[in-house]
Amino acid sequence: MAGSPMVELFAGELRRARGAAGLSQEALAQQISYSAALVAAVEQGRRLPRPEFTTRCDEALGTDGLLSRIREKLSREVLLPWFREWVRIEQEATALRSYQPLVVPGLLQTEEYARALHVGASPLAGEAMEQQVTARIERQAVLHQASPPQLVAVVDEYVLRRPVGGADVMRAQLRHLAELSRLHHVHLHVVPAAVGSYPGLNGAFVVATTPDGDDVAYLDNQLQGHVVSHGPDVLSLVRTWESVRAEALSARQSTELIEEAAQAWT
C-alpha cells in the first residue's frame, strides 16, 4: 500500500495541514494523544491512519473532515481487488442473507477475533495484516448507518465451539454476537450440531438484495472470492439458503445457545 496515490494524498494533506497550523509533528502528536513516531510514519506513507487518529487530526487541524474523506477512499483501496465490488454491493444492499459453517461472518466479528483468524490462516503479516483487520472492522459500519440492511446470518454450531484466538477472544466474540442479536435489523440463527449433514456444509456464501430488488451473491475460496450475478446460479444459492435456514434454530433459541456457549469459554 505504501506509495499508492491515496496513501500519498493523505500523507501530503496531513503534512500541509499541520504546517498551516504551525505545528511540529511532536506538537500535533501531543494534541491528538498519539506518538510523534506514528505521526511521522503516517506522513511518510509508512503507516495507514486509523479512523480515530484521522478524526483527531481533522479536529486538531481544523480541516473540516478532509482527512476523513480521503481516508474513506483509502480504506476502499486497502481492500483486496477482488473484494472491492462486493463491499460496494454490501454497502448499498437492503438485505443480506449470510451463511457460514466455519467462522463468524466478517460483519459480526470483533477486532480480536478477526486478527486471530488472520494470524492463523492468512499469508499476510505485520502492517499488511493490520490493514485487512481494520478494513474488515470498518465494513461493519453498514450495520449502524441510518438505513441499515436487514441482516439474517446463519452459522453452524461448530462456529461457536472452534477456539479461534483462545477462550478470552471467543467469550468476547460470542457476547458480541448476543448483543448484535438485539438490534432490530440483525437476526442470528444457529444450525445445531445434532442436525448432521445438510446442504450448507458445501461452503459459505452471502446473498445481497440490491435497492432495485435483484439478488446478487458472493462466494469465497482459498484463492479469492467472486461475485455471482448469473440468475440460475443465484437462484440455486437462494434455494440452498432456504434449506439452511429451515435447519436452524429460532432467533431466540439461537441467542440462548450463543450465550450458553459464551459462558462455556472460561
Protein language model features and the residues they cover:
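Basic, Lys/Arg-rich alpha-helical nucleic-acid-recognition elements, primarily the DNA-binding modules
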Residues: 1-74
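Bulky hydrophobic/aromatic packing residues
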Residues: 2, 58, 86, 215-216, ...
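A short alpha-helix capping/helix-coil boundary motif
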Residues: 6, 31-35, 82-84, 154-157
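Short, functionally important structural connectors and interaction interfaces within domains
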Residues: 15, 34, 88-91, 99-100, ...
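Acidic-residue sensor for enzyme active/binding pockets
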Residues: 26, 43, 90-92, 157, ...
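Short secondary-structure transition/capping segments
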Residues: 39, 78-80, 201-202
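Short, charged recognition helix plus adjacent turn
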Residues: 68-99
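Hydrophobic protein-protein interaction segments
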Residues: 95, 99-266
